């Protein structure tokens, strides 16, 4: 069985004059507005954001083209992402910001070629030289993921040079390097100092400081930080997305003593104006049943569904998949998960398991492979384990020791429980000729994902922090 494989700018000045004339004549009533689009996006109103961005993008506004393309990339739909790349390319002819976004997309694009990675490096370097500091972090991530393409580049040396110039994004790149190297915990003091300095310029520092204090168990500093975060959010200086991410830190038991009560209070404050928080609230109840009951969870999810939040469909699918809160119903689970799959990699993992395990009455091996491959390449380590099991066990499918070995190795590298035992069984049955073939396929799969892909798969999204033009200020 073959391994499945994933599948001229208008004159801006002319449109500016036209739009200005219309605005003067009509008093701006009903006209598309980029500020409204951004505000709608921040509160999770995707329909309003998209309609405003689309109208402005059609008139050739580069910033609106970038905003619309960002939404299309975030959708997870391959057809929408192809449209996004086209928009980025149009805007990149005049906008350094668009060049940075195009480079960032090509760096993170699933199945991107070496030529696309090199184009990404060129675009990001060019945008950075033109004063677009947001290009710095994705450029470092690109070097970290594909070191074989730039053997002459030492990421740490580059970061040191940029930090010597006082660039805030260089400090952020250093934090990312610590994360990918697994040395974050050894640098908590430095990270705290850096993020106190740049807190008012990089909103991601709220997340980093909350993480530091959670890992240190410093309840007093955490309390002060949360008070400041609430004030900054109410003043419009911090988006709801960042408050949501801080609540996630508070609820994460792997970082230290979790505080689900405070996390819930934070999320309930922002949910009415930031609908994605309804899903985070439901997930909090899922993980901490003492915080509420099924009726409350479903109420949260209903609010999220009403706001067209795909993560709500993911969590509903999971509810009916595992039967933890509601009776198991694989068909309901499948229906919800299919709605979420375009933008939520976890949904593909659960769909793959439904098809692999025969939860719908029989095994659907090709459907299982298709969804598990998507999940695995999006950073879901458990999907690699499931693929290794599928091809080694041969349930409803011809066993394939080579494929089983490839995904078993990937699962072991990500420290998936029981993966070593499974890989040992696979290796014992693998003749030398097949082992050589498997090693080649493994190398190809690793290169397609990039080095450190699991650690960096979401960095280009979660660390895209805006820079506010203010002087650095300590807490």
Swiss-Prot record:
A lipid is attached at residue 28 (N-palmitoyl cysteine). Disruption phenotype: Cells lacking this gene in the mucoid strain FRD1 are phenotypically non-mucoid, i.e. non-alginate producing, and secrete high levels of dialyzable and low-molecular-weight uronic acids. It is a lipid-anchor. Residues 448-466 have a biased composition (Polar residues). It is found in: Cell outer membrane. Transmembrane segments: none annotated. Residues 1-27 form the signal peptide. The keyword DNA repair does not apply. Residues 436-475 are annotated as: Disordered. GO terms for cellular component: cell outer membrane. GO terms for biological process: alginic acid biosynthetic process. Its main location: membrane. InterPro entries: Alginate_biosynth_AlgK, Sel1-like, Sel1_AlgK, TPR-like_helical_dom_sf. Pathway: Glycan biosynthesis; alginate biosynthesis. SUPFAM superfamilies: HCP-like (SSF81901). A lipid is attached at residue 28 (S-diacylglycerol cysteine). Keywords: Alginate biosynthesis, Cell outer membrane, Lipoprotein, Membrane, Palmitate, Signal. Belongs to the AlgK family. NCBIfam families: AlgK_TPR_lipo (NF038194). May be involved in the polymerization of mannuronate to alginate. Interacts with AlgX. This is Alginate biosynthesis protein AlgK. It comes from Pseudomonas aeruginosa (strain ATCC 15692 / DSM 22644 / CIP 104116 / JCM 14847 / LMG 12228 / 1C / PRS 101 / PAO1). The lineage of its organism: Bacteria, Pseudomonadati, Pseudomonadota, Gammaproteobacteria, Pseudomonadales. The gene is algK.
